């Protein structure tokens, strides 16, 4: 095992739990959204407004490929990473994949508290609670099909990281 990938909806805690997990393993952490923003020189919201979703999705796939070249790394991915079949295959083949799963109501309440919510472009143009419910309904099957393990992301990030550590230990 050289890489661990965290997938799930916005506000599921991928980045925070990923940092904790990486620290406990003595590994690096990477975030594909941060990688895209660094390369683009702007926020994802600005990139999508300027260039559109297809350009962002292509940049996101490039960030995943770059992450797949790293070793001893926990990679937090953007919520839409699973939308492309080639990304799903790269995730499953590239390492252990954890789906951080939480109900839409929990995710919506976290989004309200998120200080970087303005950097997240709307996916549907709807209000955040309705948007997260619709997007989660659309993507849940893809997350589950891609993941090797599903973890309960309703808990604090440290507990989520603990769940992942236990699953890794049990898998040997």
Swiss-Prot record:
ATP binds at residues 8-15. It holds the Pfam family SKI. It is found in: Cytoplasm. Keywords: Amino-acid biosynthesis, Aromatic amino acid biosynthesis, ATP-binding, Cytoplasm, Kinase, Nucleotide-binding, Transferase. GO terms for molecular function: ATP binding; magnesium ion binding; shikimate kinase activity. It catalyses: shikimate + ATP = 3-phosphoshikimate + ADP + H(+). Pathway: Metabolic intermediate biosynthesis; chorismate biosynthesis; chorismate from D-erythrose 4-phosphate and phosphoenolpyruvate: step 5/7. Its EC number is 2.7.1.71. One of its GO terms (biological process) is chorismate biosynthetic process. InterPro entries: P-loop_NTPase (IPR027417), Shikimate/glucono_kinase (IPR031322), Shikimate_kinase/TSH1 (IPR000623), Shikimate_kinase_CS (IPR023000). One of its GO terms (cellular component) is cytosol. Belongs to the shikimate kinase family. NCBIfam families: PRK03731.1. PANTHER family: SHIKIMATE KINASE, SHIKIMATE KINASE 2. This is Shikimate kinase. It comes from Oleidesulfovibrio alaskensis (strain ATCC BAA-1058 / DSM 17464 / G20) (Desulfovibrio alaskensis). The lineage of its organism: Bacteria, Pseudomonadati, Thermodesulfobacteriota, Desulfovibrionia, Desulfovibrionales. The gene is aroK.
């Amino acid at each position: 095992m050289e890489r661990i990938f965290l997938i799930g909806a916005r506000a599921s805690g991928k980045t925070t739990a990923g940092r904790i997990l990486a620290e406990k393993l003595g590994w690096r952490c990477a975030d594909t959204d941060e990688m895209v923003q660094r390369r683009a020189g702007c926020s994802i919201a600005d990139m999508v407004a300027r260039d559109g979703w297809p350009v962002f999705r292509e940049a996101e796939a490039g960030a995943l490929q770059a992450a797949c070249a790293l070793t001893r790394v926990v990679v937090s991915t953007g919520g839409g990473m699973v939308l492309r079949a080639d990304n799903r295959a790269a995730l499953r083949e590239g390492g252990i994949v954890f789906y951080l799963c939480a109900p839409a109501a929990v995710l919506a309440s976290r989004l309200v508290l998120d200080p970087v919510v303005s950097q997240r472009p709307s996916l549907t143009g709807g209000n955040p609670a309705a948007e997260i419910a619709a997007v989660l309904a659309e993507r849940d099957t893809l997350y589950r099909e891609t993941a090797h393990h599903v973890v309960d992301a309703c808990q604090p990030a440290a507990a989520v990281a603990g769940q992942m550590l236990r699953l890794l230990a049990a898998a040997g």
